[in-house]
Amino acid sequence: MTLDTLIDSGKRFLLFGGKGGVGKTSCAAAASVWAASRGYDVLAISTDPAHSLGVIFEQKIGSEVKAIKGVKNLSGLEIDPKVAYRQLQGELSKKSTEDLSSFGIESISDLDMGSPPGADEALAFAKVLEYIEKPDHDLIIFDTAPTGHTLRLLSLPDVLNSWLGKMIKLRYTMGRIWGGLKSLVGRDTDERDESGKALEKLKATVEKARVELSNKDRTSFVPVMIPEAMAVEQTEMLLTALYEFEIPVSNMIVNMILPQEVSCKFCESRKAMQDRHLKEIRRLYSDQFRLTELPLLDSEVRGIDQIIHLTKFLFEK
């Protein structure tokens, strides 16, 4: 069963995820190229700190949206959590720092409550939110980080919401104190706390993202796995989290399957192991999801030609 119906289903967000090394970036890249070839305006976003997306497309992508060479209608973006973290910190603290400097406090961080759990991932998620809000692209395809990072990413709407609520309360409490101090030194007390407004805007965006990511008409998460014990285990963990966060799943990819006929003892042993796990995967998931089974290719997926070759298995066979 192929993924073609998923691409043409009218969804705006597709997320590919799974254990490290199972080929999720290759699948995300192939889905992006296939969708773009059908006339959709596509943005492929990597939230994986390793950023393999640029490696597969054989071009530098980076932290600004960039057209993918050789593919019409396709752009790429690699979100660097540390850069996103610094940018948002700067936006939230700039106005408060200006106010505090008059009283001998150099930075809002001197008075801050600290960062949310998984701060760098949280702020990378905040960067993702910008693109969830923008109507610039027909389809956004996410190449997510390995399972553990992705589970934290999926929990961030709740984490950020709680943290932002506390931060907003603190900012406005301190705003009243700053207002009193300003009046003592003759400064304008009517000026709004810009960092507080920025926090409120971010909180509203997080709420919107929660709604978008749980909307089955708009979003689908595609777990990618290989027929090995660890990958099966981590996929089950991922699915449990996806259900908990109400993120829709309709398709699943089983990658790197050996051919039926193998000709060496090592290959026979690996094939027997894969067959056991493949049987279990089909038993567990074939009634719940559309399973797409991909063969182990004879070369790595790098460059447009190899990506197009992979699309034939994902979408045509």
Question: How should each PLM-predicted stretch be described?
Answer:
Residues 1-8, 207-317:
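C-terminal lobe/tail of nucleotide-utilizing enzymes
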Residues 1-14, 22, 27, 31-200, ...:
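Nucleotide-state-sensitive switch-loop elements of NTP-binding domains
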Residues 13-16, 57, 103, 125, ...:
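Phenylalanine-focused residue identity feature
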Residues 19:
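P-loop (Walker A) phosphate-binding loop of NTP-binding proteins
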